[in-house]
Amino acid sequence: MRLMSDKGGLEGIVVARSELCSIDGQKGILVYRGYDIRDLAEHASYEEVVYLLLRGELPTAAELDSFRTELAEARTVSGEAAQVIDLIAADAAPMEMLRTAVSATSFDDPDKDSNDEDANQRKALRLVAKIPTLIGRYQRRREGKEPVDPVPELDYATNFLAMLRGELPAREEARTFDVAMILHADHEMNASTFTARVIASTLSDMHSAVVGAIGALKGPLHGGANEQVMKTLEAVGSVERVDEDVRRRLAEHRRIMGFGHRVYKTMDPRAAILKQYARALSEHADDSEPNWYEMSSRMEEIVLAEKGLYPNVDFYSASTYHYLGIPTDVFTTLFVASRVVGWAAHVIEQHRDNRLIRPNSEYVGPARRAYPIGSLGS
């Protein structure tokens, strides 16, 4: 029997069995390896979630200490990857840089010639550790500043923000960022994860799968949406203008990014969590700027009332990242930094029971035709 989604885009088609992540779109539930995302966001660190997705279980205290040490030791970026960033930082867009720099990290990876599971676990750990350093180095270079070296004693989120901003974040900022990373770590069979699994199914290597996934995430219908959300908020400019602007956009049938989701038919649980963190950050924000949280909250009310659409994770991640002092065009690279562990875990899972992913297409072109011998090209 040949199955095809009535709506296209493989919607509703199951393409793999996975132990990593499950979504109940009707109830708004997201689970990583059996753990509800709300519990992980409240109690876990990003490092614990990385361990969970890669190793299958949450770590003990001793395992977590050892794992954090491994991650910290792998943060340093040198060789070709560092040279690539220094060369292109002034001209390359953030996702272009990251796509290229991640590929360059494969050149001197000690396991580059191995594709077994142990090697892929080590590659995954190194990618999780190095991508924040790549992003931080790029941001500092394009600002004309010296890169901030990773500090082994700092946790993932604190170190990441310090490399980006050149100063240590407040504890509340680091925790907010840590939660944002947790929320983006995996999300079942999205476009970039599917891309990674297709590449992995050819028995290609971990870095190739991740670079392909970055290419998929670059698109505005996937990872780039939070940048568009922030640009929309900036264009609106104030809480007082939200009603008029949003209603005009809706009347003109213009899409408002950050609303609706292919899977969720209710509030995206990740958006609900980030909304609370954005609100908390807004209470200590610079009064000279618009209240991005209040603007977002009012936009949510109008779009839900007028269109029946709920915000997705991109919507409140925009104001959250802005409050953390992160440039808008860097937002999608943060998505990569978080999601790389999900991609890597899917690559490992694909390799365990691999079959080449090779679907069919339905031909809708002309019927078979005879070649008109002698009547063409004369």
Q: Language model features by range: what are they?
A:
Residues 1-378:
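Non-transmembrane, aqueous-exposed alpha-helical and coiled segments at domain scale
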